[in-house]
Amino acid sequence: METICLAPCKKNAARLAAHLVFIDESGFLLIPSVQKTWSPVGQTPILHHRYRHDRISAISGIAVSPKRFHCMLYCQLYEDNIQGEEVAVFLRHLLRQISGHLIVLLDNGKTHRSDSIVELLSRTSRLHLEPFPPYAPELNPDEGVWNHLKKTLANGRPDTKNELMDVLSDEICRIAASQNLLRGCIKQSDLPSFFP
């Protein structure tokens, strides 16, 4: 694999004393994702569920503070697909929650280049967007949050979107409360280490 140079982002973050924020989106279905399980010998495990394709879409960001390297998780859940307007709403939420400059690293998806985001960037001098290289999800630490959530929720079977929303909210709060888990998501990515 060729080496990926994200050094300019790190240098700009240090120069601006900016928070680094890694953003990604994901979706969760009412149909459970089946993982490995166990059962007594000769008894096949059966997972009962309602066969509905309802889903919850989520956008989150792992923010790393510039001085103490403290990690924070920000997340918003939606009942519909995430479009450019929802990404802009999330970015405005980050700007309200985090003081100082933000360098936001995200994939180069179409929703991240929408008119509402271009307008937000033109009005906000402390927000800087940097795309990850194409086809490189392994560089985004926020993928670790989604992987952890999907493993935690595997074999579960919420009956309604509200139940799924409640379960997701509880698990996201648990992840957000764990510095070790958030740092682990960053360390498991293929990014060069920047923790002291």
Regions found by a protein language model. Name each.
Residues 2-92, 188-194:
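Extended, low-complexity cationic-aromatic segments
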Residues 26-29, 63-67, 109-112, 135-137, ...:
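Short, solvent-exposed loop/turn segments at secondary-structure junctions
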Residues 23-27, 60, 91, 106-109, ...:
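Short, conserved catalytic/metal-binding motifs centered on acidic residues
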Residues 17-20, 142-196:
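C-terminal anion-handling pockets and recognition modules
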Residues 107-108, 115, 130-154:
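RNase H-like two-metal-ion nuclease catalytic core shared by retroviral integrases
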Residues 84-130:
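RNase H-like DDE/DDD metal-dependent nuclease/strand-transfer catalytic core used by mobile genetic elements
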Residues 22-23, 103-106, 131-133, 186:
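Short beta-strand segments
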Residues 43-50, 123-141:
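RNase H-like polynucleotidyl transferase catalytic core
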